[in-house]
Each structure stands twice: as structure tokens, then as C-alpha cells.
Amino acid sequence: MKTSMQRKLDQLTTRLAELNDLLSREDITSNLDQYRKLTREHAELGPVVDHYALWRQAMNDATTAQELLADASMRDFAEDEIRAARERMEKLGAELQKMLLPKDPNDDRNIFLEIRAGTGGDESALFAGDLLRMYLRFAERNRWQVEMMSASESDLGGYKEVIVRIAGEAAYSKLKFESGGHRVQRVPATETQGRIHTSACTVAVMPEADEIGEVEINPADLRIDTFRASGAGGQHINKTDSAVRVTHLPTGIVVECQDDRSQHKNKDRALKVLAARIKDKQSHEQQAKEAATRKSLIGSGDRSERIRTYNFPQGRLTDHRINLTLYRLDAIMDGDLDELIAALVSEHQAELLASLGDAD
């Protein structure tokens, strides 16, 4: 283990002891906000410090066994002990490296998931519906809550555009690598000759702002229009101007919400989505600056980048960023995304470790 890493772990051990003292003080426990903040920090540091204690124990075991090598009768035993202790140190050291990786501040946030049909017309809209079902099934498996924010349905089913809010533990950390272009290859239901067509959708995963105030939005920068909500094919579904369109003039970002009969609720939803889109835009601008110095395969989230192909005739999914191919498309489309997400997270961690190594 590098000296710099050991020094950092010693500091965290000291900090955990400080937190134990602070959390036992009456002036801290009576201040709910401060108590929550310190409790969260304690929960994050605990596993790291525990791992470090095991690493130090393994190092002590190796040192003790080293002293036994001089005794011929104990040499074989000592060599076995040293080997086992070093293996534990190596394993724990690798785990500690990952634990110390910079944490994405958005990882614990709820998200807005936006799917837009792209090239391919009706087939693209149908695939957008299939992607939505895939993510909703994954949300069910994780016991996340889902709320429909906005939907523009196509005439033959599916969606031209759909936005849902997904709330639950680690929603952003698990789905943040889904942003980008998703391509499908299959025989459309409308195809009479049995030919395989290619179409595409784009997915955007945006962390929800904790409060709308977290993203600075000047009311003077907003244009808010109301209109009658309409369903698929353009038919009006109610007779009041309950649908809301919010335009953020400085960025040109437009959000429409019409799924609720209440204009107030639609406006509230639209403002939440707008805040998330502005935050997402700011985040991407920051990432673009960082990308000038370090190219990331996984985390760019570029909407125009084709990240994945779903080949239905072959039952194959390919993630082009990490050259991963899985022949279990039916299960994946039914929401079984764990293997895919684990591979993306692992690659992202490897990139972070490599960048830290370069920095050293």
C-alpha cells in the first residue's frame, strides 16, 4: 500500500473516533440537521475504517510470522502464515482503493429518465416503449417508486418522448451510464417482407435537484404557456387548459407536462424536470472541460454517442463502450440489468483508479 493512501486511512480512522465522540454529545443530538449530517459521514467512514483495521491486522500477522523464520522448527508454519497474510493484505488493499475512489455527489439522488424516439419512425417509438418497460421492470426489482412526468404517445403505440421520475436508493448510481444512443435491429411488426430494420432512441438520465432552489432559475427567464392536453393522434382529452409548457429562455430548454388534470401539478412537474435538465446541462459542460484532459469511455453520457445495440434476431445485446456482448436479450428487456450495470460500474472504477495512478 502506498504511503499516501495509508496516511489518508490514518486520517479517516482519527476522524471516525472524533465522530463517535461528537455523536454522543447532547448539543449535537439536539440539532437534527447536524446530527443527520454527522451520522451520514459516520456510516460512510465505518466500513472503510473496518477494512483498514483488518489490513493492519494482516500486516501485524505477517510481521509476527517473519520473526519466526529464524526458528527452523517453525519455518514452514511461518512461511504459510506470511503467504496467507500477504494475500489478505493484497485483497483488502484493492478493496480499500475502490472505497477511497471519489464519490459521485449525485449517486444517491432520484432521477428523471427521458427516452426519445429517434431515427426509424413508428418502430423507433415502439422501441422507446420497450426501453421504458425495461427500466420500469428494473425499478420494480429494486423497489423504486416511479412517477410518470410527461408522455407523448405515437399513433401505433410506444412513445415519441416520455419522461418518468424514479425515486429510490442508488437510482442515479445504477442508471447513470444509460445515457446515450440505443440502437435496435429487428423485424418490425409492420414489416410484411420479414426484413430487419434498424432504428434508434436516445436516453437521458438526469439527477433530480434536491430542491428547485439548488438550481438558480430566474422567474424572469421563464415563459409559461398553457394549452389543452391531447392524447395519441392529437385528440383533446380534456376541455381546460391544464397542460403546461415551460421555456427557459437563456438555454432554450423546453419542458411540457400534460399528464395530470391539474394545471398546478403539471406546472410543478415541469419546473422539476426543467431544474434537472439545467443541472444536467451544467454537469455536461463541466464534464466536457474535464474531457479535454482525460478521455472517459464510460461516463461521457453524450446523447449523440451510440452506446448499445439490441439485436433481436440473434438475442444479442452489445455495449460498445466496454465491448461487452450478452446473449440473453429477453431477460435484459424484462429488466434483468444487474450483470450489465455491474460491468459498467467495474469499468468506470478501473478508469478512476487509472487516473489516480496517473496523478501519482
Swiss-Prot record:
Principal subcellular localisation of the protein: cytoplasm
GO molecular function terms noted in the UniProt entry: translation release factor activity, codon specific
Signal peptide: none
SMART domains, per database record: PCRF
Disordered: annotated segments: 280-300
Compositional bias (Basic and acidic residues): 280-293
Protein biosynthesis as UniProt keyword: yes
Positions where N5-methylglutamine occurs in the chain: Q235
Superkingdom to which the source organism belongs: Bacteria
Entry GO CC: cytoplasm
Keyword Transit peptide tagged: no
Post-translational modification as stated in the protein's UniProt record: Methylated by PrmC. Methylation increases the termination efficiency of RF1.
Keywords: Cytoplasm, Methylation, Protein biosynthesis
Pfam families attached to this UniProt entry: PCRF (PF03462), RF-1 (PF00472)
Compartments it resides in: Cytoplasm
Family assignment from sequence similarity: Belongs to the prokaryotic/mitochondrial release factor family.
Known function: Peptide chain release factor 1 directs the termination of translation in response to the peptide chain termination codons UAG and UAA.
Protein's UniProt name: Peptide chain release factor 1
